[in-house]
């Protein structure tokens, strides 16, 4: 499926001033917090995962990959790899409670046309959708410190492999696609000194 190109975020030469500066400030704060971590949707077993990065302006980019090297054919003796490189933008988050914000996907773009195929070096590459984000109608952001026992069990089921025994609060931010019941857990963002320092502090505590 093809995605529509998103409308430009700003107009050239025009300063766009929001009437609701409080909402903008809170939105920026949420995205700034989300941007401290990278996010993973994976089962903990198998070769598939979706990696996601959120930026301070609410935009995001990521990739999904899965490998089935046992599925071969005459033209692809080395198996099949499913891929999706994508980018997009979240809408302005709406506060639900102290640790939860609700949002939607405002736009989504794919690097390659979904369902397209290429064969390279004996491997068939099939371009798929963004597993974990596809079909999303409502997405929840969970802030660091959120009580785990108050989160949806469907979300906790996905993130449980990343939790320590006895852990009662999230030590990172998380993302939950309610529609597809897909949960992303947070991790140290590569190149982020702030999140690295935070992770080191948590290890010491």
Task: State the predicted function of each range.
Residues 46-116:
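N-terminal glycine/threonine-rich, aromatic-flanked beta-hairpin/loop signature
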Residues 37-39, 52-54, 60, 90, ...:
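Hydrophobic beta-strand residues in large extracellular and virion-surface proteins
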Residues 1-12:
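Sec-dependent signal peptide cleavage junction
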Residues 109-204:
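Beta-strand-rich cores of mature extracytoplasmic or soluble domains
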Residues 37-46, 79-83, 130-131:
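Short, solvent-exposed secondary-structure boundary motifs
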Residues 20-51, 61, 176-190, 194, ...:
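Tryptophan-anchored aromatic micro-motifs
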């Amino acid at each position: 499926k093809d995605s529509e190109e998103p409308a430009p975020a700003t107009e050239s030469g025009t300063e766009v001033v929001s009437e609701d500066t409080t909402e903008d400030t809170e939105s920026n704060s949420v995205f700034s917090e989300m941007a401290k971590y990278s996010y993973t949707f994976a089962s903990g077993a198998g070769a598939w995962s979706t990696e996601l990065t959120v930026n301070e302006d609410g935009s995001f980019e990521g990739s999904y990959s899965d490998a089935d090297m046992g599925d071969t054919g005459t033209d692809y003796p080395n198996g099949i790899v499913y891929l999706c490189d994508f980018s997009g933008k979240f809408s302005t988050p709406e506060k639900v409670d102290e640790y939860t914000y609700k949002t939607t996907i405002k736009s989504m773009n794919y690097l390659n046309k979904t369902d397209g195929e290429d064969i390279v070096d004996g491997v068939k590459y099939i371009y798929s959708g963004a597993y974990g984000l596809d079909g999303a109608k409502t997405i929840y952001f969970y802030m660091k410190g959120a009580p785990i026992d108050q989160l949806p069990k469907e979300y906790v089921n996905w993130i449980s492999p990343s939790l320590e025994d006895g852990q009662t609060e999230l030590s990172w931010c998380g993302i939950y696609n309610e529609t597809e019941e897909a949960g992303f857990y947070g991790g140290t963002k590569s190149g982020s000194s702030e999140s690295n320092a935070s992770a080191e502090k948590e290890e010491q505590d």
